[in-house]
Amino acid sequence: MLSKQIPLGIYEKALPAGECWLERLRLAKTLGFDFVEMSVDETDARLARLDWSREQRLALVSAVAETGVRVPSMCLSAHRRFPLGSEDDAVRAQGLEIMRKAIQFAQDVGIRVIQLAGYDVYYQQANDETRCRFRDGLKESVDMASRAQVTLAMEIMDYPLMNSISKALGYAHYLNNPCFQLYPDIGNLSAWDNDVQMELQAGIGHIVAVHVKDTKPGVFKNVPFGEGVVDFERCFETLKQSGYCGPYLIEMWSETAENPAAEVAKARDWVKARMAKAGMVEAA
């Protein structure tokens, strides 16, 4: 794994739904992936993972050891429902408690990176106060992550507050902590009026992983690869030439499809072909 030029992973929600991680990791291995990214979203079912018992956590660690397929990252989107910028103190406190539990969970099972959703609020109206509370919440979260030696990494979003690497870098400079980095989504980055290549170059040195998906302006999910606006070859070329050597994660939501494995295999082949064209020869 350490000698592999391009670590390639798959998002949990691309694979069949369920709570058996041994089965999920075995399938990911069969499909040729190096790792799976766990989702902890705003649903009660996935939030419940943060309250797993010691035995449940050990079962995940054991599944990783048995298959050799890692779970190095968590997509923590639960803060849509419990935002750190909420003006409701009880909701905001719940958001911070979710963060604490997520960091503890990551520490227990070996997750290194928690991808954060860059929303001050999601279902409410944003304002100066929600942004201030969000900044303060991030500061408290990064302090917790530092003590646990876990990295928090901001996603580039489908939301104006965090829709460019430049904006996320502003938070990185404000927090000034090595445990806060960036986790750009080249689909989200491309769907806005960004100079995508310049943005990617600006983030080098702070990018710990990259989400790979296609998008259209205003459409951020479930756009089939090749039908959106993302110039994948140029993005891969820019990242390669800038010296980025980290993982790539194919983000899909095919868990309820008739044949999720077939959908994932098709997307994998499409993405790897673009990587090969970009000179990432090991991807072919």
From Swiss-Prot:
Gene3D superfamilies: Divalent-metal-dependent TIM barrel enzymes
Transcription regulation listed as a keyword: no
Single GO MF annotation: intramolecular oxidoreductase activity, interconverting aldoses and ketoses
Induction trigger: Induced by L-ascorbate. Repressed by UlaR.
Enzyme class name: isomerase
Keywords: Isomerase
Its EC number(s): 5.1.3.22
GO BP terms in the entry: L-ascorbic acid catabolic process
Record-linked Pfam families: AP_endonuc_2
Pathway: Cofactor degradation; L-ascorbate degradation; D-xylulose 5-phosphate from L-ascorbate: step 3/4
Catalyzed chemical reaction(s): L-ribulose 5-phosphate = L-xylulose 5-phosphate
Function: Catalyzes the isomerization of L-xylulose-5-phosphate to L-ribulose-5-phosphate. Is involved in the anaerobic L-ascorbate utilization.
Family to which the UniProt record says this protein belongs: Belongs to the L-ribulose-5-phosphate 3-epimerase family.
Protein name from the UniProt record: L-ribulose-5-phosphate 3-epimerase UlaE
Naturally occurring in which organism (per UniProt): Salmonella typhi
Name of the gene this protein is made from: ulaE
